[in-house]
Amino acid sequence: MAFRPRKRFGQHWLNHEPTLQAIVAAADIQSGAPQSGSLRDRLLEIGPGMGVLTKQLLATGNPVVAVELDRDLCLKLRKKLGQRENFLLLEGDVLILDLNALLQDFPQFSPLNKVVANIPYNITSPILELLLGTIQKPRVPGFETIVLLVQKEIAERLTAQPSTKAYGALSVRMQYLARVDWIVDVPPKAFTPPPKVDSAVIRLTPYPVEQLPGDRRLLDQLLCLGFANRRKMLRNNLKGLIAPEQLTTLLEQLALPSTARAEDLSLEQWLELTNLLPTFLPPT
């Protein structure tokens, strides 16, 4: 009897060969020779489901660690793929598991350096934080490449440009932490069962933490305040931090009008604001 997807786990299984190939290609998986160690990519897959994408990843010859929450699916995956030497299946919640600790006994699968996954859409935000960290606390060490199949709305927000409807704090945060590339659109019919939303494949290339510019704590604070109320102008959202007339002067230095809203500032302008703001504040 066929295994029926469970709604509570947000299960929609990808069965569209062109999309599967696009995901694997976007990861640019380097196989190298087994004895070369560091030249081989070690892959993390979140929510392998029925193992369709997993099999394509395993076909590269690279070590693949798959994390699956559904116990029944784990049983099926072990029967189907459990004999592969380059496959390690971990049962549990990826948001809770300590992967570093679990992989200490499996050195051939560690350290994981790339993520390739069709993630459950209902936990996209916490998974992004797990994989990238936050502005104040980026993930260290970071992954080299993260290829995710996500809801199209999320892809639009992650890649959005200033002064657009989709642009918000999430856009700035993710673009600060990583380069974000839109790979391909994915229609509902590519899944079983078809979701009620469109999807897209994105690739995140995290920046090394030592290359992240600016005062990360202040940038995070400004984003929280600035986007707290999208309808308000920055001079109102930030008035608890800086006097409106001072902010107007500061915005002029950024070639922005005094009526600017948070959504009008590019990542570069947010960083400029972060760098200039301390010169307008009284000494502490």
Curated annotation (Swiss-Prot):
Signal sequence, renumbered to the chain: none
Residues given in the record as S-adenosyl-L-methionine binding sites: 12, 14, 47, 68, 93, 118
Subcellular location as annotated: Cytoplasm
EC nos: 2.1.1.182
GO molecular function: 16S rRNA (adenine(1518)-N(6)/adenine(1519)-N(6))-dimethyltransferase activity; RNA binding; rRNA (adenine-N6,N6-)-dimethyltransferase activity
GO terms (BP aspect): rRNA methylation
Positions of disulphide bridges: none
Keywords (A to Z) from UniProt: Cytoplasm, Methyltransferase, RNA-binding, rRNA processing, S-adenosyl-L-methionine, Transferase
GO CC, alphabetical: cytosol
EC class: transferase
Catalytic activity, as annotated: adenosine(1518)/adenosine(1519) in 16S rRNA + 4 S-adenosyl-L-methionine = N(6)-dimethyladenosine(1518)/N(6)-dimethyladenosine(1519) in 16S rRNA + 4 S-adenosyl-L-homocysteine + 4 H(+)
Membership in a protein family: Belongs to the class I-like SAM-binding methyltransferase superfamily. rRNA adenine N(6)-methyltransferase family. RsmA subfamily.
Function (record text): Specifically dimethylates two adjacent adenosines (A1518 and A1519) in the loop of a conserved hairpin near the 3'-end of 16S rRNA in the 30S particle. May play a critical role in biogenesis of 30S subunits.
NCBIfam families reported for this sequence: ksgA
Cross-referenced HAMAP family: 16SrRNA_methyltr_A (MF_00607)
Protein name according to UniProt: Ribosomal RNA small subunit methyltransferase A
Organism: Synechocystis sp. (strain ATCC 27184 / PCC 6803 / Kazusa)
Recorded name of the encoding gene: rsmA
